[in-house]
C-alpha cells in the first residue's frame, strides 16, 4: 500500500496520504469519535503496521471518546511520574502555557517509557489547543536505521542489551526530578527513576517480524555486556545514526488531530518553537510486551 495516495477499504473509504516516501501518513475520512466497525478497525491497524505513524485529521474528541478509541486498539499502559487527569487515571494532560519557560516535556529523541519491563506498544496524542505555527513532532524510524547498518555492525549488536533508566529525566537530579510550581504539568520524580531495565539493542516487532534498533538518547544509559567507555562509543554512534534526516518525518499539528505512533520501532521528539502560544494535548499509551 505504501506510496498509494488513496487507501480504499473493503467497507470504508479511508484516505491515507503518505508524509514521506518511507513512513508516516495523514489519515482522513474516518470518524474515531464513534466506535469503529470491524472493517474500519482492520484497515486502521493495517495502515498503522505499514506507516508506523498516523496523523488522523479533523476529529472532535472528548476525553471519554479519546479513551474509548484507544481501548479499541489495546489496553492502557502504565504511566509513571506524571499526575493524570482527575477521574481518568490513564490520560495525561500535556499543557504548556504561553509564557511558560523551562524544559519542554517530550524533548530529546526517545521512545516512551523504554525503561519499563514492558514499554508501551503505542502512544496516542490528541491536539486540544494548538499554536498557529510550531510545535511539530518529529519521528525517526528505527527499522530503517537498523536496515542501513553494515552486516558487521548488525552482527556486533545482535547479542547486546541496552540499559534503560529514567534517572536523567525523573531522578532526584534529573531534568524533571524536582517539583516546579511554575510548570503547568505536575511531574513528580522519585527514587524509582534510578532503577534500570535491560532490553535487546535489536528487537523484533511482534506483529510484522521486522527488526529495529531499540535505543534512545533520553533513556538508554549503557550496554549491559560492555564497559562504560566501550558502550558510550557505540551508543553515541547509534544515537547519531538513528536521527539521520532520511529516517525522519514530521507531523504538523492542527486542532483535532490525533497522532498515534509505534513505540516499538519509532522514536519521537517534541519541538520547542512556539513560545508565546498555549498548547494543550491529551495523551495515552497502550500496553506493550517485553522486547525480544
PLM feature spans:
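Non-heme Fe(II) oxygenase catalytic core, chiefly the N-lobe of the double-stranded beta-helix
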Residues: 2-258, 263-292
